[in-house]
Amino acid sequence: HYGTMTLEQINERISEHASKLELEVTFYQSNHEGNLVDHIQENWGNYEGIIINPGALTYYGYSLKDALIDANVPIIEVHLSNIHGREDWRSNSIIADVAQGQIAGFGWRSYTAAIDIISGLINDQESH
């Protein structure tokens, strides 16, 4: 479901793609919801957008959801696997309604697609 690339390899692809769009990216990974919430709250105002793979927190991460709402920036929810083509419960994301959209099922390419989209959303905000 998730492919064979390591997180480091995926991050490398994301960095390469973002640099072509003249975007600066920051990576943060944690398996603990509180750490993710703290990171988002500690960095309010430092980011123009958030791309997040909430993993299992997709289904029950209410503190994460609240932190994303309060961040007040464009958010894209990303999943390596197609959560809509797996068990029914996997498609019930509580994050989806606070994100501008969701990209799922394209492996590491889900992240580069999200970079393209968030770049456009940021540019749209700056031009208004």
Where do the protein language model's features map onto the residues?
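Glycine-rich phosphate/diphosphate-binding loop of Rossmann-like nucleotide-binding domains
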Residues: 1-21
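Short beta->alpha junction loops
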Residues: 24-34
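Short, glycine-/small-residue-rich phosphate/pyrophosphate-handling segment
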Residues: 26-27, 76, 85-128
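Short acidic active-site motifs
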Residues: 35-39
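Short Gly/Thr/Asp-enriched flexible loops that form oxyanion-binding sites at enzyme active sites
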Residues: 42, 61-71
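Short acidic/histidine-rich motifs immediately flanking catalytic phosphotransfer sites
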Residues: 43-50
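Short glycine-rich anion-binding loops that position phosphate/pyrophosphate groups of nucleotides
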Residues: 55-58, 81-83
